[in-house]
Amino acid sequence: MEKKKPRTLVEKIWERHVVRRAEGEPDLLYVDLHMVHEVTSPQAFEALRLAGRRVRRPDLTVATMDHNVPTTDVRLGVRDRVSARQMEALRKNCEEFGIQLHEWGSPGQGIVHVIGPEMGLTQPGMVIVCGDSHTSTHGAFGALAFGIGTSEVEHVLATQTIPQRRPKTMAITVEGEAPPDVTAKDIMLGILHRIGTGGGVGHAIEYRGEAIRNLSMEGRMTICNMTIEGGGRAGMVAPDEKTYSYIEGRPHAPKGRAWEEALEYWQSLPTDEGATFDKEVVIDAAELVPYVSWGTTPAQTVPLDGEVPEPQNEGHERALRYMGLRPGTPIREIEVDTVFIGSCTNARIEDLRAAARVLEGHKVKEGIRAMVVPGSMRVKKQAEEEGLDEIFKKAGFEWRNAGCSMCLGMNPDILSPGERCASTSNRNFEGRQGKGGRTHLVSPVVAAATAVMGRFASPSELGVPVEVG
C-alpha cells in the first residue's frame, strides 16, 4: 500500500471541501459558514433578487450589524443617511431571504468576527467566508477562513460554494516563551515587522510554535485577525484542547454524539509530521517586546522603548510627514490625543480585563479622549457583570455599545485631522480612522497605560506588574 503524503492543516481542509475540480480552473469549495454584515451585502442581495434566485442555505448564513452602527445609545438612532440605508437594507434582505440577523443593540449583536466564535458558530475544519478582510480571525480555531468581495458574497448566497485557487502554504513558527510583558498583539506586530506587508501574499499561513500554543483562544484570534496585514490569504492555528474547551457548551456547538464525532474529526486536522510548507519563517519569542506602530502600515513598528526610525525610502518619508513625527524621537515621548480600545482585533473579554487591570486606581490624563468599545453585546454584558465597566468609567473612559467603532471611518467614532490615537485596532493607513487622523497600533495594556500618562507608556510605569496575561 502506498504511504500517504503528509499534509498540512490547510491541505486537509481544502481537500475535504472541493466539490468540483477542473484543469485550468479554480477549485469549487463548499462553504460551511457565511457571515454577512451591512456594508458588503446590499448589492449581493439585490443581484439575487434581480436574477430570481434564493439563498441556498440560509441556515448556514448569519448576519449582524457592525461597521456602520453608532456605539452610543440605540435610542438616539442613526443620523448618517448612507449608514441608515445600509442597515435598513440588511433588515429587509434578511427578512425576505430567511437569514438570522443580530439587530443593532440586540443581545447577540456585535462585530462579525467576535460573535461567530462566541456563539460556537466558528469550528475547526470549516471553510468560513465573509465580505470582510479580517475573516482570517476565525482561523484561530483551525478553520480555513478568508474575506471575499461583494460578487463572491452573491455567489456564496446563491450556491453555498466559492471558486478559489489553492493558496501556497506558509509556516510562521514563534519558538520558545514570550517575555511576560509581551501580548498576542505584540507577537503579531513583531511578525509583521519581520515579514512586511507583502510577506504572506498568496499564502495560507499556519502559526506554530510554543509561543502560539501558549496563547489563549482570544490571543490566537488576535494573531490570525491581522494575517491580511502581512498579505496572507488566511491565517490558522491548529486546534488543540484549548480550542475544544472554548467551543464546548456554546450555543451552536455540537452536542452529545455529534460532539464526539466532531472531536474525532477536529483531532485529525493538525499538520502531519513531515509535511512541508512552501515558505517558512522562524521567530525567537524571547526577542519580542511591546511594540508601537510609527508609520502608516502595520509593519512600520518599533519597540515601545525605541525611537522613530530614520527613513529608509520615500514611503517612509511620506509616512513620517503624514504622522507628524521626527526621526530619533523616543516613542515614550510621543503624546496622544485619543485612546481607543476596541475592534475585531482586541475587544474581547480578556482584552478588556487586561486593560482594566492596568487602569484600576488610575485616571485618564486631562484632555485625553478615551473610549472602550466591546466587540459584542455579550462581551459588554459579561464585562459589566465583572464590574469592568465601572473601572473604565471611574478612570475616565467612555463605555460604549458594541460595534466596529473607531477602527474605521464609517461611523460617528472618527478622528479629526491631525488627531493622534493609540489604537488597539489592526490598521493604521492614512485616513483609516478619519481624514487626517494619525493612528498608532498598540496592545490593550499599552493603550490603557498611554491613556493615563498621555504619552506612550507601559503598565510598569504605573506600578502594574509586567505579567499581562
Curated annotation (Swiss-Prot):
Keywords in alphabetical order: 4Fe-4S, Amino-acid biosynthesis, Branched-chain amino acid biosynthesis, Iron, Iron-sulfur, Leucine biosynthesis, Lyase, Metal-binding
EC number(s) reported in the record: 4.2.1.33
Residues engaged in binding [4Fe-4S] cluster: C344, C404, C407
MF (Gene Ontology): 3-isopropylmalate dehydratase activity; 4 iron, 4 sulfur cluster binding; metal ion binding
Top EC class, one word: lyase
Cofactor note: Binds 1 [4Fe-4S] cluster per subunit.
Protein's UniProt keywords contain rRNA-binding: no
Assembly mode: Heterodimer of LeuC and LeuD.
PANTHER family per record: 3-ISOPROPYLMALATE DEHYDRATASE, HOMOACONITASE, MITOCHONDRIAL-RELATED
Protein name: 3-isopropylmalate dehydratase large subunit 1
Native species: Rubrobacter xylanophilus (strain DSM 9941 / JCM 11954 / NBRC 16129 / PRD-1)
Lineage: Bacteria, Bacillati, Actinomycetota, Rubrobacteria, Rubrobacterales
The encoding gene: leuC1
